[in-house]
Amino acid sequence: MRKGYIYVIENNFDNHVYIGSTVDSLENRFRRHKADALKRPSCLFHTYMKKHGVDNFVIKLLKEVEIISILDLHLLEQNFIKDYGTLNTLHGKLKNLEINDKPTNVVLSKQTPFFTTIEPNIVKTEDVLKEITTNPSISLKELIDIFIEEEQNFGTILNEMTCQHKIYISKKLLKWIGYEGDYKKQRDSFKKLLKRHNIDFEELKSNDIECENYPEIKVDMANLSNGVISQSKWLILNIYNFKYI
């Protein structure tokens, strides 16, 4: 098991908050939030943060948990978001961004923090997955954030699995991002998620020469009968769909 953290980002001028999760330090996570807000705000929260000045926001720890997979952490995060995350796109209570005429880059007087930690009720995994895969308001960046842990680990692991900017969506990878159970069902669920968000992918057959580029595909083939191999397909995704928005 490893440690994960649920955090809240508050400001000193209103009661709107952002809920997030991380396996990195809160300091590093907050630093990335501020960098995204200043350089490339692409979501409700970062747009709000940039408008009102990043120095008017502060990050606080809500809960430290022991987790088996990243999905465990995000299931807990989604419950906090449902109850409190007014600046989160997923379940956020600000459907349309309304930015008041506040001065930017000026630290305002600190008000009493609105947020108090309350343990939320945990919802079923399938309910969260259904929301994630059917909610049209979730951007690709937020979709990736839901499943993929911090980028330093993400980049290292994916680079090891990548060939010519493409990655094989193996059973190991699906397990890593939180999928469980039968591999075929895992893969089919993941394909639905990709289609829902218009993310292109390929499916290789056993006679495709590209299969030779992926050691894990060759290992899979070695453990299958000829009849099963001829009917099998291997899901391939462009790595840039994960790394870049």
From Swiss-Prot:
Residues 2-97 form the GIY-YIG domain. Pfam families: GIY-YIG, MSV199. This is Putative MSV199 domain-containing protein 146R. It comes from Invertebrate iridescent virus 6.
